[in-house]
């Protein structure tokens, strides 16, 4: 069975950019977006046409799709050197923080390492402003972004306690993408 690496970070931190670049240097690894796999399954079942519609499905159906996506990703990992799963550690909602990797997902995925990609809250705020023309982003203040990153750390350690995974924190600062990518690649190669 190949390795399962979960890569995560708050919106705007650059987790997808780091993982997309890292996988280019990791032979036999594939980069998978968890939400894309969920959408694929929901479409196959004729439940949705677009990603935003998943949120409107009954909670039980969403959980089922989450579980099926985790199972599919774990199966993909069996056929590769490893899978890098790009997903949310926690999701900030009006009602509070939602775990991005509930127990039924962790049981299927069994990650080897959870990589938290972080940056300074001010850097993330500026990235979100730049991205706002292409993507719909939340405009959190620096202290809210800092809180979200802390919540991600706490959730990641809880996930690690449940699965035996390690937790690695990688900083992705402005104009230093190569350093973050190098550290990510080194982390994966150390497994």
Curated annotation (Swiss-Prot):
It comes from the Archaea. InterPro entries: Adenylate_kinase_AdkA (IPR023477), P-loop_NTPase (IPR027417). Keywords: ATP-binding, Cytoplasm, Kinase, Nucleotide-binding, Transferase. The keyword Nucleotide-binding applies. GO terms for cellular component: cytoplasm. It holds the Pfam family AAA_17. It is found in: Cytoplasm. GO terms for molecular function: adenylate kinase activity; ATP binding. It catalyses: AMP + ATP = 2 ADP. Belongs to the archaeal adenylate kinase family. HAMAP family: Adenylate_kinase_AdkA. This is Adenylate kinase.
């Amino acid at each position: 069975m190949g390795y399962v690496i979960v890569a995560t970070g708050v919106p705007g931190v650059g987790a997808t950019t780091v993982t997309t670049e890292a996988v280019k240097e990791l032979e036999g690894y594939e980069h998978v977006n968890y939400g894309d796999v969920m959408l694929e399954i929901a479409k196959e079942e004729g439940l949705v046409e677009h990603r935003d519609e998943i949120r409107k499905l009954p909670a039980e159906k969403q959980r089922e799709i989450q579980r099926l996506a985790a199972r599919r990703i774990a199966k993909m990992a069996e056929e590769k050197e490893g899978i890098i799963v790009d997903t949310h550690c926690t999701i900030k909602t009006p009602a509070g923080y939602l775990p991005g990797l509930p127990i039924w997902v962790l049981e299927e995925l069994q990650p080897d390492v959870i990589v938290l990609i972080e940056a300074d809250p001010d850097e993330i705020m500026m990235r979100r402003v730049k991205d706002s023309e292409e993507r719909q982003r939340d405009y959190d203040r620096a202290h809210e972004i800092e809180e979200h990153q802390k919540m991600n750390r706490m959730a990641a350690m809880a996930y690690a306690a449940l699965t035996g995974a390690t937790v690695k924190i990688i900083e992705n600062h402005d104009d230093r993408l190569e350093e973050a990518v190098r550290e990510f690649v080194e982390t994966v190669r150390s497994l």
